C-alpha cells in the first residue's frame, strides 16, 4: 500500500468529511445547524458513470481515483498492475490476468466518517481463488474496514474490521453466512454501504438492506470509528490460505477475467 503521507496524517487528525455527489464533485457541503442529517439510503435512479474520470498513477492530490501498481502479501505473484484498471466507454473495467490483479482507490479527500457508497457492477466469471471486491472502504492508518467481497464460487460476503491490540482484526462477519450464496458469475448487482463511524454499517443489495452491524454486534464491542474511503478491485488470493477462497488455477497467457463497474456514487 502507498506510504502514509504527511498530508494524509494531517487529514486523518482532522477527520475530514468530504461527501461526494457523483464521481467528480468533491466539494464539502456542511450540514446546516439544527437540521437532521440526511438519511443514508440508496438512490432509485442510475448511478453516475465514469465518464470524465482519468486513471493515472500517483495523482493523489489532483485525481479522484488512482490505480494501484504494487504488490501485497495476500496477492502472491498477482500484484496490482496499471494495465488492469481502465475506463472504457464510461465504465470501469478491472481485470485479472496471469500474474496481475487490478485495483483503484479514491483520493484522500474522499475520507468520510459518515456516508453512503454505491456501485452498479457486473461480476466476472468467478473461479476458486478469485476475489471480486467491487466496493469496500478502508483506512490504512486506523485499520477500519468494511467489505463487500465475492469469494471464489462461494458467494457474496460482508465483513467489518478494525484495529484491536495493534492488529487488523475481523470483528463482525454476518455470522459467516454469505449475503448471496453460490457461483455469482456474470451477475449484475447494485451494492450499497452506509457507514456511520462508531455507530453502524448497513449493507444494501439492489436497494434492499440485507445486513446491519453495530458496536453491540461486534466482537468485544470493537467497531470502526475513523474516516474511510473507497477501494474497488479484482484479485487473486494466491498469498492466502486456499481454505478461504479455494485453489486458484493459473490461466493461459493472454487470458483474462474482467469485472465491469457501470456506475459509482459516494454521498
Spans of features found by a protein language model:
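Secretory/extracellular carbohydrate-interaction modules
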Residues: 94-159
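Short, aromatic/His-centered strand-loop micro-motif at the edge of beta-sheets
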Residues: 166-188
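Short, tryptophan-glycine- and acidic/Ser/Thr-enriched carbohydrate-recognition patches
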Residues: 48-81
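Localized edge beta-strand/strand-to-loop motifs within extracellular or lumenal beta-rich domains
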Residues: 187-201
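N-terminal secretory signal peptides
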Residues: 1-21
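Aromatic sugar-binding interfaces of carbohydrate-active proteins
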Residues: 200-259
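Short carbohydrate-recognition loop motifs
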Residues: 83-99
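Extracellular/lumenal carbohydrate-interaction signature centered on repeated Trp-anchored short motifs
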Residues: 107-117, 179-187, 223
